[in-house]
Amino acid sequence: MAEAYLLDKLKSVEQTFQEMTRRLADPDIATNPDELQRVAKIRSSLEETVNTFNQWKEAQEELRGAKEILKESAGDPEMKEMAALEVEELENTIDTLENRLKILLLPKDPNDEKNIMLEIRAGTGGDEASIWAGDLLRMYSRYAEGQNWRVKLLSESAADMGGFKAVILEIQGEQVYSKLKYEAGVHRVQRVPVTEAGGRVHTSTATIAVMPEVDDVEVEIDPKDIEMTTARSGGAGGQNVNKVETAVDLFHKPTGIRVFCTEERSQLQNRERAMQILRAKLYEMELQRQQEEVSSMRKSQVGTGARSEKIRTYNYKDNRVTDHRLGQNFSLAPALEGDIEDMLQACISQDQQAQLEQLAAES
């Protein structure tokens, strides 16, 4: 591995892993369950890196042996050919292991393991933008279904001509934020609306916000900053909706954020759900601020994920989705059915590459 700084990092990881292994073998740690869990978690997070590093060291040793055999087999063409083939295979293996190690050494996003709230908000384009927001809702629901994630509707504002002015989903499952964080931004659609009699192509947009779930400890909200009003819910509940004001409208005065929640059956449940959404929105605002600070120092190719950033165009006429961060085109029809894994993996790979370049520049 040519980069000395990577070897130094790997040796440091190896030392930490060995120390955590020794700690776990100490009988005294069993008397402190919290410390036991902390040490076990650290060790587990380093295990793949250490195992891959060991494979790399073994491959290096085998390569040295194969090169020695190649050197000594000058008078034996058959042996020389076999040794040359082994050298080539080992060099390819080492390249693969080195690339994997570089990715494993990248800093982990602390939010990657979290569930999310995904907000879809109609942008420019009037009724067509609301219909487009509904199409995106279906796309993400189908994708989540394919990932075996759980999806729950938290809040919705339906549009008169179909679709939604705004909708918020809760998505729970494994590694949800690590994938869907790349969906934040402006999604533009170019198509002939069903309401267009002249057959002209219109351009509309919807904005996606991806908010990792947070608890009370991570975001403090002063009760004095909240204004709450109630209303009669228009949702499920039979005659109850006409008698009891179960819907909750929360207004956060410092930021101007308003959350309207109607999906739960009681006012208390809707208030708790609205506070959950508000905490997630405030946390996302802080993440955006931090990302903007970072991006001013390092322009990421994948982009900042800012709400104002146009990340993708869906062109119906050409059956094409263009991801502007990647400069790549994908097929439209499968994407609308929730087949967006290739796009997300391409974003992940490009983000990793940008981080690797930054790591090399700082070394």
From Swiss-Prot:
Record's function text: Peptide chain release factor 1 directs the termination of translation in response to the peptide chain termination codons UAG and UAA.
Q: Where in the cell is it found?
A: Cytoplasm
Q: Which organism is it from?
A: Picosynechococcus sp. (strain ATCC 27264 / PCC 7002 / PR-6) (Agmenellum quadruplicatum)
Residues annotated as signal peptide: none
Give the UniProt entry's GO cellular component terms: cytoplasm
The entry sums up its family as follows: Belongs to the prokaryotic/mitochondrial release factor family.
Q: Which residues carry this modification: N5-methylglutamine?
A: 239
What keywords would UniProt list here? Cytoplasm, Methylation, Protein biosynthesis
Q: Give the main localization category.
A: cytoplasm
* Superkingdom, natural source: Bacteria
Protein name, per record? Peptide chain release factor 1
Q: How is it modified after translation?
A: Methylated by PrmC. Methylation increases the termination efficiency of RF1.
Q: Which GO terms describe its molecular function?
A: translation release factor activity, codon specific
